[in-house]
Amino acid sequence: MAKIISFDEESRRALERGVNALADAVKITLGPKGRNVLLEKKYGTPQIVNDGITVAKEIELEDPLENTGARLIQEVASKTKDVAGDGTTTATVLVQALIKEGLKNVAAGINPVSLKRGIDKTTEALVEEIAKVAKPVEGSAIAQVATVSAGNDEEVGGMIAEAVERVTKDGVITVEESKSLTTELDVVEGMHIDRGYISPYFITNNERQTVELENARILITDKKINSIQELVPVLKKVARLGQPLLIVAEDVEGDALATLVVNKARGVLSVAAIKAPGFGERRKALLQDIAILTDGQLISEEIGLSLDTASIDALCTARTITIDKENTTIVAGTTTKPEIQKRIGQIRKQLEETDSEYDKEKLQERIAKLAGGIAVIKVGAVPETELKDRKLRIENALNATKAAVAESIGPGGGKTLIYLASKVDPIKAYFEEEEKIGADIVKRALEAPLRQIADNAGEEGSVIVSRVKDSDFNVGYNAATGEFEDLIAAGIIDPAKVVRSALQNAASIAGLVLTTEAIVVEKPEKKPAVPADPGMGGMGGMGGMGGMGGMGGMGMF
């Protein structure tokens, strides 16, 4: 395919146009008075959202050069979401400001490499400063973080705080849609496994890049599965039940994996596979833990069970299973508390008998996974558009809360960034001249999120920024009330991890844009209009597709 090549100032300006197109649509959602964005869907009703990452993912520009710039911003938002779980809109506003100021200086003849070096050195120093001023989160502050991230929804904030209290800060909390109109919290048996899907072709939710299975069966084995023939008896039994299947094995490869992927794609089977956690003897023990938790059996030849003779009762059950590229969360389908307590007792006995610190740590981890359970927040609302938006808000709040617990907190509402801007001058004192300009670019960009929060609230951003600069560390602008007050006392808090990730990712992408000298993109092909063919005759020629019946072509049924 032919390529479009763009050089120098032209290439950078095209990137900037793409950056601005996406950032302008995202930044209006920032803050407690952020505006909504209506997203048209190819199928179904339009979606009304107030969530930066959701808006960013939906945008694709017609011009391929500009679209490259938009995709860079999507990368910033996505990376921040992956690392911190929140702060995507803040990261977008920061990177737009960095690129805007940076390109002005590049156009004026400043060396872009020196600018990038100044931006990188300043960012590195500011990250250390964030760690110094952050305070540990505890007690009511957990609910405050969740409330702010959920759009000042106190009910959600309290629910997330209760979930953290019930399963501990290291526990697993999931969010799912409820069939009722109310949002409620439930703690159930379940487990978090640090293994993701073997193949991305198992994905069922393309937007989230996850596998989501409901009312599923689980095949747990310590075997490595290479041939599909080993799985045929089990697959037949599960297919008759019409339930999804998760395979947990040492590995699934060769024609076994290929056949599963093909039949999942054809809709013949709803199936996914993950590798078993752990190694050696510890792996078998972990698999046995999962089997007990999910009311099934470990299929192992060591105990006289094989795949071809396994009954449907040997398969485990799960209410829901969620798998991403790195982790799997299983919510158990039935209550097996006596068996779980018995298993925990066995592990505690091993814990008492071992002298190895490593073994003690791993045994304690197993007890925590079995005893901790999973907190499930069931989101209810009508209509469907409100349900989706509410679920997004709760997921954002949950992610922000986890980030706050992990790396402490600081004042929110853009105040921490304003404080960091005041630290730039002493940081740049030993920089070279053009590097100092890079530091100044960071300093100005750090004001952009607060300015945008104020603009979205209908205030003059520059006036608000000026007043906040002259305030004490904890004092800032509460856009929800229009007051200047102690933000931490008011519950307006930013997790340090969110601020750090937003700044680091924004600086990284901005540096790439400033040092870009050429862009190579594919030239869009003009598709010729296809005239209607009067001889199509009702598409009768499709009758030959009748041979796709089930898995017959693969020898499975």
UniProtKB/Swiss-Prot annotation:
Compartments where located: Cytoplasm
Domain of life: Bacteria
GO biological process: protein refolding
Quaternary structure annotation from Swiss-Prot or TrEMBL: Forms a cylinder of 14 subunits composed of two heptameric rings stacked back-to-back. Interacts with the co-chaperonin GroES.
Expression induction or repression: By heat shock under nitrogen-fixing growth conditions. Induced within 5 to 15 minutes of the start of heat stress, levels peak after 1 hour and expression continues throughout the period of heat stress. Repressed by heat stress under nitrogen-supplemented growth conditions.
Residues reported to bind ATP: 29-32, 86-90, 413, 478-480, 494
A molecular-function term among this protein's GO annotations: unfolded protein binding
Species for this entry: Anabaena sp. (strain L31)
Database matches in HAMAP family: CH60
Cellular component aspect of the GO annotation: cytoplasm
E.C. code: 5.6.1.7
Primary enzyme class: isomerase
Name the UniProt record assigns to this protein: Chaperonin GroEL 2
Role summary: Together with its co-chaperonin GroES, plays an essential role in assisting protein folding. The GroEL-GroES system forms a nano-cage that allows encapsulation of the non-native substrate proteins and provides a physical environment optimized to promote and accelerate protein folding.
Gene3D superfamilies from the UniProt entry: GroEL, GroEL-like equatorial domain, TCP-1-like chaperonin intermediate domain
Alphabetized CDD domains for the sequence: GroEL
NCBIfam families named among the record's database cross-references: GroEL (TIGR02348), PRK00013.1 (NF000592), PRK12849.1 (NF009487), PRK12850.1 (NF009488), PRK12851.1 (NF009489)
The reaction(s) this protein catalyses: ATP + H2O + a folded polypeptide = ADP + phosphate + an unfolded polypeptide
Keywords on record: ATP-binding, Chaperone, Cytoplasm, Isomerase, Nucleotide-binding, Stress response
Family according to the record: Belongs to the chaperonin (HSP60) family.
